[in-house]
């Protein structure tokens, strides 16, 4: 009986010693002789097992995962791996750009709506000015003002409208109404058919003085900069979308497959690609994309220059919210010269003025309904200009986005960072050698040739668009100090109008006019301040490779500490029986 027990214990001890190898033994198991693990892995990618051999095969038909011996991969499996590798790459690119893309999309929407709010406020201010001071000019004035600000909105959105024509049309339309309703109320009906003559006389006689030219200058400069700013943001979105959905070359697809999936064919499920090998592959695959980096950097810096100059007459918020004051001054100018104008226009338009000029009552101090023109007094951080500066600071943190993409992809995919016991695209190696890996790849892929092919056509197109917008941004950017230049002061501003805080700049030049701060509250009217986690597509799914590695990592941890302790206990009991 004792002999039987001793024999049984010896057998159990031998089996346990085989089941629990020492720590010094290499962790990777030998290739699966039955391809069972490979079949389990592949079924996660492709339901059904008809493409997976039950036992290793020669693999003579393989084109990417070239075997050095029997393999558990077929040609169909290889094709599926290539497709999956490309999808993994696209997903990693989208994950890399998620925060940047949402930042630009969010701000493009915020600023577009904010500009529309500014236009709407400016129209309301101007209508209120007419209603409270020139009621006889409404509703005609309301119609002309509405058309003008509609054109302003369309121009900001990119419509092919000439700003000078917009301003001329406004004053051409206003003057006949001012002449017949304000300067000559009670004009006979027979004399009301001179509108075309009055429109022409308005320009010939400069009846509004230099105010139309002043408005042209202010509105043109501010709207041009605003439009370029929005165009630049929209192009930024287009650039990110383009690189998010790049179709990589066949050579790149093969390289990715060798790196991520060819190890499966040898049954090496737990082995990760070498970090250095990943860098080599990504530099080859993304050589064309990285060429965007130079123009992307210039894009952000040029946009910063533009934003730094967007104040005073280059700030549409400042200009449009003060426009009602300038229009009022222009009408006041007409009234001051009404006598001379009436005589001259009477001769020019062949209209004999039988009655003495009678001007409508006009109060000395402009009264504006403060309830209509009320603008919330807000903190500096909530203004348009501060929001623009905040955007630029965030964009500058992404200035190296494209040059850093290869490193990002490798750091966010399963790789062996220390380059030990890792997959080099052909076999499991104790330590990765870049030179050896490059030499081993020459028979399959020429990395130098891949880089020299240049960027894909779609990347070349986006680079051309970046060059164009960068040129526009440089053209529209205001050199530092130019806003306080003497030439601009002559256009209707005094150098003392603005302090260090450009958000305090105001428009208008009339004495006694109510000054309207160009500060609009964002938080009350715009609700775009979302967390990045709320962005569409922010919940990125793990790549198939990640899921597989995680699953099989758990499967590989069968030798738990509890089982190890159990084996030790059994060994002690057996030793006791053997001794006794």
Swiss-Prot record:
A Pfam family per the record: Glypican
Compartment(s) of residence: Cell membrane
Keyword Ribonucleoprotein found: no
Phosphoserine found at: 352
This protein's name: Glypican-3
Modified how: O-glycosylated; contains heparan sulfate and/or chondroitin sulfate. Cleaved intracellularly by a furin-like convertase to generate 2 subunits, alpha and beta, which remain associated through disulfide bonds and are associated with the cell surface via the GPI-anchor. This processing is essential for its role in inhibition of hedgehog signaling. A second proteolytic event may result in cleavage of the protein on the cell surface, separating it from the GPI-anchor and leading to its shedding from the cell surface.
Similarity section: Belongs to the glypican family.
Quaternary structure and partners: Heterodimer; disulfide-linked. Cleavage by a furin-like convertase results in production of alpha and beta chains which form a disulfide-linked heterodimer. Interacts with DPP4. Interacts with FGF2. Interacts with WNT5A. Also interacts with WNT3A and WNT7B. Interacts with hedgehog protein SHH; the heparan sulfate chains are not required for the interaction. Also interacts with hedgehog protein IHH. Interacts with CD81. Interacts with Wnt receptors FZD4, FZD7 and FZD8; the heparan sulfate chains are required for the interaction.
CC annotations in GO: cell surface; lysosomal lumen; plasma membrane; side of membrane
């Amino acid at each position: 009986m004792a002999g039987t027990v001793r024999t049984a214990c010896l057998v159990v001890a031998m089996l346990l010693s085989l089941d629990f190898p020492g720590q010094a033994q290499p962790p990777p198991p030998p290739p699966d002789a039955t391809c069972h693990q490979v079949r389990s892995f592949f079924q996660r990618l492709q339901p059904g097992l008809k493409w997976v051999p039950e036992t290793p095969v020669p693999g003579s038909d393989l084109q990417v995962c070239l075997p050095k011996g029997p393999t558990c991969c077929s040609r169909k499996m290889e094709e599926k791996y290539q497709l999956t590798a490309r999808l993994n790459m696209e997903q990693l690119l989208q994950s890399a750009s998620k925060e940047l893309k949402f930042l630009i999309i969010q701000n493009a929407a915020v600023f577009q709506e904010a500009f529309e709010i500014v236009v709407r406020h400016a129209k309301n201010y101007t209508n209120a000015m007419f209603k409270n001071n020139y009621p006889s000019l409404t509703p005609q004035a309301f119609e002309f003002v509405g058309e003008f600000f509609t054109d302003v909105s369309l121009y900001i959105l990119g419509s092919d409208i000439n700003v000078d024509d917009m301003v001329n049309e406004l004053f051409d339309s206003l003057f006949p109404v001012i002449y017949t309703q304000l300067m000559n109320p009670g004009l006979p009906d027979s004399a009301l058919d001179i509108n075309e003559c009055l429109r022409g006389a308005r320009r010939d006689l400069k009846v509004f003085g230099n105010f139309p030219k002043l408005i042209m200058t202010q509105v043109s400069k501010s709207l041009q900069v605003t439009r370029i700013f929005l165009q630049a943001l929209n192009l930024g979105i287009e650039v990110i979308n383009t690189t998010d959905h790049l179709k990589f070359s066949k050579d790149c697809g093969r390289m990715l497959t060798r790196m991520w999936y060819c190890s499966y064919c040898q049954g090496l499920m737990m082995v990760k690609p070498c970090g250095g090998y990943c860098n080599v592959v990504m530099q080859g695959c993304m050589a064309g994309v990285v060429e965007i980096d130079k123009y992307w950097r210039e894009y952000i810096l040029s946009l910063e220059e533009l934003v730094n100059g967007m104040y005073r007459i280059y700030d549409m918020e400042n200009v449009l919210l003060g426009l009602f004051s300038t229009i009022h001054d222009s009408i006041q100018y007409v009234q001051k010269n009404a006598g001379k104008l009436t005589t001259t226009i009477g001769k020019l338009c062949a209209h004999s003025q039988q009655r003495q000029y009678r001007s409508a009552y006009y109060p000395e101090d402009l009264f504006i309904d403060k309830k209509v023109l009320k603008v919330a007094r807000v903190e500096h951080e909530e203004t348009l200009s501060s929001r623009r500066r905040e955007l630029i600071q965030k964009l500058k943190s992404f200035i190296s986005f494209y040059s850093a993409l290869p490193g990002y992809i490798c750091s966010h995919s399963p790789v062996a960072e220390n380059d030990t016991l890792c997959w080099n695209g052909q076999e499991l190696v104790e330590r990765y050698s870049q030179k050896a890996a490059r030499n081993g790849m020459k028979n399959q892929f020429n990395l130098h040739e891949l880089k020299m092919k240049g960027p894909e056509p779609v990347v070349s197109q986006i680079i051309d668009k970046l060059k164009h917008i960068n040129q526009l941004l440089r053209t529209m950017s205001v050199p530092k100090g130019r806003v306080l230049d003497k030439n601009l002061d002559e256009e209707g501003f005094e150098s003392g109008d603005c302090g260090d805080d450009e958000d305090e700049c105001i428009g208008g030049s009339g004495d006694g006019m109510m000054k309207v701060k160009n500060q609009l509250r964002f938080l009350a009217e715009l609700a775009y301040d979302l967390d990045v986690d709320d962005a569409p597509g922010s919940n990125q799914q793990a790549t198939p490779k990640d899921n597989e590695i995680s699953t099989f990592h758990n499967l590989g941890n069968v030798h738990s500490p509890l089982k190890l302790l159990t084996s030790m206990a059994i060994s002690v009991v057996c030793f006791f029986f053997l001794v006794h």
